[in-house]
């Protein structure tokens, strides 16, 4: 049911009576007009529809095109009563411009009718930005409105230049932005089918559009498409690649299309693989600098499958390895700095050195602390890499910075302190010594009260003393948890499993479980590899037969779990 008219014309007056200008303005600008109504019939017969308002320069046609209740049927009636479609408003807007950039649910027929009534060819400079503004309006204002393929075709056929630029953008720049934002969460845009998008882009190309035109920032349309965060429609991206966009063009920031995608804050693994494959298939080998930048920038970015992506990149780019540095940092440094735990895990598994320093002598732990943007995850990331750190000086440095560490999760902070007390046997004594110092107590006031902090340390220390009293064969549970040598820990595997279920340890139970699982899987894969290579070890023609089995086991234990797994289950080559 339509809304009641907010203004009703008096149609019972004599035809000789003059209709007031403000009445017409109100009627065409704000009323929900029925194309069959007697009011509309009365107006078009008794009023000069081409009369302009003094200030705005609007005619009846302009007013109606700005009406929120616009319909194609009413517009057709106005066009049939000889409205002037070439008159501009005071701001220079022509009716066809308003129609294409302001109105919803436009009929292709009325667009043709309006264009045909204008004797000027659309190549005239007054219409040069018409196609661009039509698509731009669908990108910026009328987000739920579709881009009509027939309208695009008509505008191009009528002579509009598809390469016209406004603020550096062409119509294709805006169209690619529309395609990217359709799939961005929260945008509420009308879906664009891949087939339709392909037809529209083909129309542009057929009419001479430059697919690699640059905006003021040096971006091609494909740059813009890939730079939109959460643009993750693999099928749309695959379709755009069929037009062979130029992958070598760098924008003003030195970024190629692939690097634009890598730095977009959201990476979909399958799209990343597709882009690199397309580049190497159609362009050739990627420059070493770009390969290095892709890997390092990827680590900084959120991705759907980080472990799969970093594995793919490291295998694909053979000259990028755990020792490669970029801006003075290794891959592992960057992974720690940006809290990418899955990448950290992978790089350590392939023998990345967690204790290596940057070119300006910073440890990975310091990079984590210095990155304030990731402060909510600082404790968790430090906690994650502590299992790999054996350098006592690094642990001591971490302990000294405890007052400045941001605390967002008490449980994580408690676990972090438990690690520090376990690995630094001077921590508790130094804490007790400084407990009464006002300066020391004040340093902890930023995130929690000193009493609460002191309580956590005391609780962890008490449980540490319990670890020292718990015997495991010829040593203590405390010594076992401090040990990082899987070969030595193997003999304590059964005892660790028993203590793992001991409810006396509330704080250190997680660390026990980590140690147990690490030793368990290491031992399992060493046994698998030994069994698999046994025919080699026992072959009389092999020099390895000269080595005692104990030495062979020692060598196998030097390998990472990842190395052992790959020997046990070699990756299949596609």
Curated annotation (Swiss-Prot):
Signal peptide: none annotated. SUPFAM superfamilies: Ankyrin repeat (SSF48403). The keyword Repeat applies. Residues 541-574 form the F-box domain. PROSITE patterns: ANK_REP_REGION (PS50297), ANK_REPEAT (PS50088), FBOX (PS50181). ANK repeats lie at residues 56-87, 135-164, 167-213, 217-249, 253-285, 327-356. Gene3D superfamilies: Ankyrin repeat-containing domain (1.25.40.20). Disulfide bonds: none annotated. Keywords: ANK repeat, Repeat. This is Ankyrin repeat protein B18.
């Amino acid at each position: 049911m339509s809304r009641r008219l907010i203004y009703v014309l008096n149609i019972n007056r004599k035809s000789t009576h003059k209709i007031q200008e403000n009445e017409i303005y109100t009627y065409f600008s704000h009323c929900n007009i029925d194309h069959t109504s007697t009011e509309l019939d009365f107006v078009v017969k008794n009023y000069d529809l081409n009369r302009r308002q003094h200030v705005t320069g609007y005619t009846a046609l302009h007013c109606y095109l700005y009406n929120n209740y616009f319909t194609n049927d009413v517009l057709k009636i106005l066009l049939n009563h000889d409205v002037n479609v070439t008159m501009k408003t005071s701001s220079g807007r022509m009716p066809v411009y308003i129609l294409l950039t302001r109105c919803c649910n436009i009929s292709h027929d009325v667009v043709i009718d309006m264009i045909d009534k204008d004797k000027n060819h659309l190549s005239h400079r007054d219409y040069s930005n018409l196609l661009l503004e039509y698509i731009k309006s669908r990108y910026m204002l009328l987000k739920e409105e579709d881009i009509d393929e027939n309208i695009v075709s008509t505008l191009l056929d009528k002579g509009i230049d598809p390469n016209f630029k406004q603020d550096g953008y062409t119509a294709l720049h805006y169209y690619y932005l529309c395609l990217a934002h359709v799939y961005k969460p929260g945008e509420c845009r009308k879906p664009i089918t891949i087939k339709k998008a392909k037809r529209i882009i083909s129309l542009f190309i057929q009419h001479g559009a430059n697919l690699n035109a640059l905006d003021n920032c040096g971006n091609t349309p494909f740059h813009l498409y890939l730079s939109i965060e959460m643009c993750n429609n693999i099928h749309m991206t695959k379709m755009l690649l069929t037009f062979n966009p130029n992958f070598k063009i760098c924008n003003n920031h030195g970024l190629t299309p692939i690097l634009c995608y890598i730095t977009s804050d959201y990476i979909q693994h399958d799209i990343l693989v597709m882009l690199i494959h397309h580049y190497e298939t159609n362009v050739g080998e990627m420059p070493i600098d770009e390969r290095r930048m892709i890997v390092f920038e990827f680590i900084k970015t959120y991705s759907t499958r980080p472990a799969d992506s970093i594995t793919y990149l490291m295998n694909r780019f053979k000259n990028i390895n755990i020792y490669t540095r970029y801006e003075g940092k290794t891959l592992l440094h960057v992974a720690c700095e940006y809290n990418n735990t899955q990448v950290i895990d992978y790089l350590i598994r392939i023998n990345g050195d967690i204790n290596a320093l940057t070119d300006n002598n910073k440890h990975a732990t310091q990079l984590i602390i210095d990155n304030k943007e990731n402060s909510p995850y600082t404790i968790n990331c430090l906690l994650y890499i502590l299992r790999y750190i054996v350098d006592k000086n690094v642990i001591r440095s971490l302990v000294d910075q405890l007052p400045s560490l941001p605390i967002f999760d008490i449980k994580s902070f408690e676990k972090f302190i438990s690690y520090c007390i376990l690995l630094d046997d001077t921590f508790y004594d130094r804490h007790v010594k400084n407990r009464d110092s006002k300066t020391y107590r004040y340093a902890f006031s930023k995130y929690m009260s000193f009493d609460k902090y002191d309580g956590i340390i005391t609780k962890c220390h008490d449980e540490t003393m319990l670890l020292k009293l718990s015997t495991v064969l010829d040593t203590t549970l405390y010594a076992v948890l401090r040990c990082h040598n899987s070969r030595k820990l193997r003999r304590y595997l059964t005892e660790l499993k028993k203590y793992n279920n001991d409810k006396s340890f509330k704080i250190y139970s997680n660390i026990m479980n980590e140690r147990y699982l690490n030793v368990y899987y290491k031992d399992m894969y060493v046994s698998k590899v030994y069994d698999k290579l046994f025919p080699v070890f026992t072959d009389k023609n092999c020099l390895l037969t000269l080595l005692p089995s104990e030495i062979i086991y020692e060598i196998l234990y030097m390998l990472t779990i990842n190395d052992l797994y790959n020997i046990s289950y070699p990756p299949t080559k596609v």
